[in-house]
Regions:
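Bacterial N-terminal signal peptides
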Residues: 5-17
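Contiguous beta-sheet cores, especially beta-hairpins with glycine/small-residue-rich turns
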Residues: 21-198, 267
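Second-shell loop/turn segments in exported
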Residues: 60, 172, 230-238, 337-344
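Compositionally biased P/S/T/G-rich terminal and signal peptide-adjacent segments
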Residues: 199-227
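Terminal, regulation- and interaction-focused segments at domain boundaries
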Residues: 218-248
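Non-catalytic interaction/regulatory modules that flank or connect domains
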Residues: 231, 243-268
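A cross-kingdom signal targeting lumenal/periplasmic-facing segments of multi-pass membrane
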Residues: 262-453, 462
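Long, low-complexity, intrinsically disordered segments
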Residues: 470-497
């Protein structure tokens, strides 16, 4: 088993600290907002600030350290309001400056590529577009309840009240609390100097730890299972106490999933009908070596369709080693008997997400990529989803994590993701009153007219983009080749082999 060292020596860093480099257009930056924004609370010209979650590197050199401040402004914010003027809400950001820890400012030109785990979509020019209010269960039921408000008002009011309780209208406004994560892309190259400062003090694992890891990985299954079917790959391994791990993930904004119960089923239904998030949504049970996971962590914003998630299993005969399978849900897919989440093909992106989030908290003491190649890892499991991976495992050693770094004013674990009851009730009444022949005709004509001016939406960036990964930790150049691990014989369109 080969080990790919993930560390920078101080001498190597200092040797290029005075060299200028060009960060090419197309480079992605992952930014965590410290300013709450929204279509109804933000205005053109409002200032916005955030922090880089992952350090930005190019050709093996750190150019923008982790936790650098990013400044921008609201270029435009269009509220949905009563829906008389606009089909959907929208907001457009313009980030223009990065400030390093030493005070140096770097001008940048960017566009928003994706809002992490959000129901909102992004147009090709970077405008964030909100949901359409009629695309909901409440709107469908309004076709029945709305006429009753006019034909038999007392009965219609009763039916409307019941409908508002069982299928409230979603809030079409955009709201991103502090802690929302944006994936930005440079639209023009940036010249800057490589940084001699590490975002964290990354160390190498000791030979004893590497030997322990090698023995554990060789004796463990490389893929979790759901019943008799292969599922998520083991791509991370943690060394540290249970308490340190819980503190680190809490500081990083990851929360534990709830167990399945009647109450969790109600909350899931509530989130689906309102098109809101459910941060602690239950997850399917997966086993590794015949054992169910000890922890299930996840991170999402305002939708149940998308989330980052990580299952953890305690290593055999030990209390300080944890095997993990990290993946990202990007939507729903339906089967004959049920529906489930569809995962992003590139699981290395999610491995990088987990490590970078923990590194941001300052609780990461050491990390190393362990190269793993095994015939059974590449076997065809007769599934329908494809996986892109270099097959490496990120081995992370945590410190005690008594004082994690937390962005001031940002509560990642409990950010607001649901409208108030008043907002929801008003939205239901508004939609019902609008379901009549006159307004439906007007709304249809308006929708057809405005669609001529709306820009097309981006494809899901989780598949066709390259968010910050772990190149900042690697002694190898960026752009390391990945293997195409297939779940069936034919690769999907656009997949890289």
């Amino acid at each position: 088993m080969q080990y790919l060292r993930l560390g920078w020596s101080i001498s190597a860093l200092l040797s290029f600290s005075l060299c200028a480099h060009e960060l090419p257009a197309g480079t992605t930056l992952e930014v965590r907002l410290s300013t709450p924004t929204g279509s109804s609370i933000s205005h053109t010209g409002d200032q916005v600030e955030g922090r880089t979650i992952a350090p930005i590197g190019f050709r093996g050199q750190i150019l923008v350290p982790q936790a650098s401040r990013v400044f921008g402004s609201i270029e435009s914010a269009t509220p949905f309001g009563l829906g008389l003027k606009h089909v959907t809400a929208s907001i457009h950001y313009q980030f223009h400056t990065v400030r390093l820890a030493n005070g140096e400012t770097i001008p940048i030109q960017t566009e928003v590529l994706e809002v992490e785990t959000a129901k909102e979509r992004v147009e090709v020019d970077g405008t964030v577009r909100g949901i359409h209010p009629v695309a909901s269960l409440s709107s469908s039921l309004s076709l029945v309840t709305a006429p009753m408000l006019f034909v038999a008002p007392p009965v219609g009011a009763l039916v409307w009240g019941i409908k508002s309780l069982i299928a409230p209208s979603p809030n079409p406004e955009i709201y991103f609390p502090a802690g929302t994560e944006l994936l930005l892309r440079l639209t023009a190259p940036v010249e800057l100097r490589s940084s001699a400062e590490r975002p964290i003090g990354v160390k190498s694992l000791s030979p004893e730890e590497l030997s322990k890891v090698e023995k554990l990985l060789n004796g463990s299954a490389q893929r979790a299972r759901m019943g008799n079917h292969p599922s998520d790959f083991v791509n991370v391994l943690f060394l540290g106490s249970r308490e340190a791990m819980e503190r680190a993930f809490h500081a990083a904004g990851w929360v534990q999933a709830e167990r399945k119960s009647p109450m969790s089923l109600y909350r899931m239904y509530h989130a689906l009908t309102r098109r809101n998030g459910y941060k602690r949504a239950p997850m399917n049970t997966l086993t590794l070596n015949g054992v169910s996971s000890d922890f299930v962590y996840q991170k999402s914003l305002d939708t149940v369709q998308k989330r980052h998630h990580l299952r953890l299993w305690k290593g055999p005969n030990t209390t300080d080693v944890w095997l993990g399978a990290a993946a990202e849900d990007i939507g729903f897919r339906f089967k004959l008997t049920h529906w489930t989440h569809s995962t992003a093909p590139n699981i290395d992106n999610e491995r990088g997400k987990v490590v970078n989030d923990l590194a941001f908290t300052g609780c990461l003491d050491a990390v190393e990529l362990v190269s793993r190649q095994s015939p059974d890892l590449l076997q065809d499991p007769k599934g329908k989803q494809f996986i892109l991976t270099d097959t490496d495992v990120a081995v992370v050693r945590l410190d005690v994590c008594n004082n994690p770094r937390i962005m001031q004013g940002v509560d990642l674990a409990s950010g607001r993701d649901q409208p108030s009851r008043f907002s929801s009730g008003f939205g239901s009444l508004r939609n019902d009153l609008r379901h009549n022949i006159l307004f439906t005709t007007y709304n249809t004509l308006k929708l057809v007219t405005q669609r001529q001016t709306l820009k097309p939406l981006r494809k899901t960036p989780s598949i066709d983009s390259n968010p910050p990964g772990l190149d900042w930790l690697s002694s190898l150049p960026a752009g390391k080749a990945t293997s195409f691990v297939s779940a069936s014989s034919d690769p999907p369109t656009g997949a890289i082999q």
